[in-house]
């Protein structure tokens, strides 16, 4: 990455991003907070993971986070986006990921949480997001990632789950949200991630998928999510993590992507936006920092492309008893 360190290149303003994340948490009356209230659990996961990648998780009160998190658990075992809301598989994964960051998985009634997730599997192997039944390969990934962290994959039919994901594969090598749906980088991350976690990557046509994914890089260096769309920092996560999982990351220009991400920073107040000059938000701050982690940017911890958690956390949770 020698060209990334040329003199005119802006640097990662890590301390400002840390301050931005800590402030975003405090500003409960802000417009962003009101709009995001129902998905606070997901926002907390993005913010806390970013802090951990920057080695600053110690700046938040673990006790405060965990006591709030536990108020979001529903009697079914699933977690809601905030206190008093309905449970959903996405917030359940976020809650489990946050507890993983703090090495506190064991405070959970693991049997109850894993049963909530397992009950969302359908006869054809697919997963619904909650009791209302929407089906999407996002939920297949979420279920598999969550149950893998909880070491409860045996509670679902993994073979059928994999078969359903493979039925969402397209001729271009990509994956969609349901069988026959158009390939999209976000869904590709979900399908490739779920296949990686279950040891099923042999179902992926790595060359055609790698080709489709590397075509997402535009002239300015940023990546888009499908043909004809604008580049967006979040695809530095969805596309790059997928390329890494299929060993094709060397097919894109990494230095140009680093520059695109760094150009999306608010150098004064911290935070990262979707593209240069747009307003920053907590999601794109995570995607930018996580993207830089995948690009081996100095000073950022290494993130696992399948679990979306720092590698040291994954090693602690998954690879120890
Ligand atoms: C733990 C990393 C992690 C994820 C949890 C929620 C989830 C599982 C995955 C979501 C995957 C997904 C579908 C991401 C895409 C989000 C997105 C930017 C959608 C908008 O796509 P388009 O194509 O619009 O409608 P753009 O903005 O690309 O022009
Ligand atoms: Zn985006």
From Swiss-Prot:
Cite the binding residues for Zn(2+).
232, 234, 284
Q: What is its EC number?
A: 2.5.1.60
The record's cofactor note says: Binds 1 zinc ion per subunit.
Q: Name one GO biological process term.
A: endosperm development
Q: Which GO terms describe its molecular function?
A: metal ion binding; Rab geranylgeranyltransferase activity
Q: Indicate the quaternary assembly.
A: Heterotrimer composed of the alpha subunit RGTA, the beta subunit RGTB and REP; within this trimer, RGTA and RGTB form the catalytic component, while REP mediates peptide substrate binding.
Q: What is this protein called?
A: Geranylgeranyl transferase type-2 subunit beta 1
Origin organism is: Arabidopsis thaliana (Mouse-ear cress)
Upper lineage is: Eukaryota, Viridiplantae, Streptophyta, Embryophyta, Tracheophyta
Gene symbol of the encoding locus: RGTB1
């Amino acid at each position: 990455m020698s060209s990334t360190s040329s003199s005119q290149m802006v640097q990662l303003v890590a301390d400002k991003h840390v301050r931005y994340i800590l402030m975003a948490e405090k500003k409960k009356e802000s417009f962003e907070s009101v709009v995001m209230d129902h998905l606070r659990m997901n926002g907390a996961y993005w913010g806390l993971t970013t802090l951990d990648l920057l080695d600053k998780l110690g700046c938040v009160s673990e006790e405060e986070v965990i006591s709030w998190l536990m108020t979001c658990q529903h009697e079914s075992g699933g977690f809601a986006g905030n206190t008093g809301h309905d449970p959903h598989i996405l917030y359940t994964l976020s809650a489990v990921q946050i507890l993983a960051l703090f090495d506190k998985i064991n405070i959970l009634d693991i049997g109850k949480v894993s049963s909530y997730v397992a009950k969302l599997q359908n006869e054809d192997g697919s997963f619904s997001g909650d009791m209302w039944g929407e089906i999407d390969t996002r939920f297949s990934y979420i279920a598999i990632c969550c149950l893998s962290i909880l070491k409860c994959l045996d509670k679902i039919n993994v073979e059928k789950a994999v078969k359903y994901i493979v039925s969402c594969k397209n001729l271009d090598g990509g994956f969609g949200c349901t069988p026959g749906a158009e390939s999209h980088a976000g869904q590709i991350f979900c399908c490739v991630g779920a296949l990686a976690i279950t040891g099923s990557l042999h179902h992926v046509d790595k060359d055609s998928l790698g080709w489709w994914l590397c075509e997402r890089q535009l002239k300015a260096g940023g990546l888009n999510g499908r043909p004809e769309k604008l580049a967006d920092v979040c695809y530095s996560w969805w596309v790059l993590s997928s390329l890494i999982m299929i060993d094709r990351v060397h097919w894109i220009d990494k230095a140009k992507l680093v520059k695109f991400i760094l150009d999306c920073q608010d150098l004064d107040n911290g935070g990262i936006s979707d593209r240069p000059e747009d307003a920053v938000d907590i999601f794109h701050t995570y995607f930018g920092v996580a993207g830089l982690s995948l690009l081996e940017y100095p000073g950022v911890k290494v993130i696992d492309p399948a679990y979306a958690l720092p590698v040291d956390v994954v090693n602690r949770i998954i690879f120890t008893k």
